[in-house]
């Protein structure tokens, strides 16, 4: 097997829903991180074998968004590109697709990542193309519809309620978890831990349609440093009557993009690139759609087995926080399977409840956060894992490459 490495992972700051990045389309955000990777590496984009990016929203004006963003970023016309979609693991799929292509000899070096502008997912008027003969037409919120599973007909938050019931997770436990996520993220931001992975996004401020200023967004804007358990308790459940899942203990809808080079170790050396980690193994698992949040507890064991590792070998875990209930359920399920689940290793700089979950971007974004923290701590192994809408889980195991 060829040794496959990750080079210069970067991400945009995460924008709140309708926030600072709302006027940036998913292709704009992707082009920004593509350019940043090329600038940081000094890489001639003509050497790329292909560009692969994950995206869920699939904007109609940017069909095959990987190709659109690649050309916007100045990547030569001769470099092909394609887009992958595995819901919340789309960014991870871009990396593992590149890994597979490398192992089969299709190429040696790929530009990978994920992008999402949930703020720009539209309302749609279904049936309007052929006209309406009678009565009212109804606008469909494509974002809300996209977050609803078509098999079990439950929105993602309702599937988190299912896990809270199954694993006996209380509202207070969820709120406490969420508060800790915000506290850790706030401290990490304050200490500059995200600075190396974030590339600024310039936005235009307008008044009455006229440009009045330009501003560079450099920080994630979804962190709520003032959240307490008492304040979290005031939020009502929104997915089930008398439920426990609330906006306070769920990830916020958000916007962002991430990118990196995935290539062979030999190619990195030949081009003078400095890898930050190597890919040890990866795995995807499938579960009941109504319990989709438990997916990581079945993907992690598969990836560990492939790598010949135990959970005790892992130093850091980035577990995407779609919902506090879902994360707590994953921990309980891992323990039930006999694993030594150590929360001190998990999301040490906070997670998506505080930092956002731009769905097609997140799995790639977590690679950036994980690898930089692995370098700081001189950790050997790290896991990037997430639940996946539709009833799946994804897991990527990385090994740090010293950059000293």
Regions found by a protein language model. Name each.
Residues 158-161, 197, 204, 280-354:
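Active-site pocket-lining segment
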Residues 1-61, 65-73, 80, 159-171, ...:
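Conserved active-site "lid/cap" helical segment
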Residues 85-116, 164-193, 259-266, 332, ...:
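Active-site-proximal alpha-helical scaffold in enzymes
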Residues 1-24, 36, 228-294, 298, ...:
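Condensing-enzyme catalytic core mediating Claisen C-C bond formation in acyl metabolism
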Residues 109-162:
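Flexible glycine-/small-residue-enriched beta->alpha junction loops
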Residues 55-110, 150-155, 226-252, 336-365, ...:
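Conserved catalytic cysteine-centered active-site region
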Residues 10-12, 22-32, 40, 173-270, ...:
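N-terminal extracellular/periplasmic Venus flytrap/periplasmic-binding protein-like
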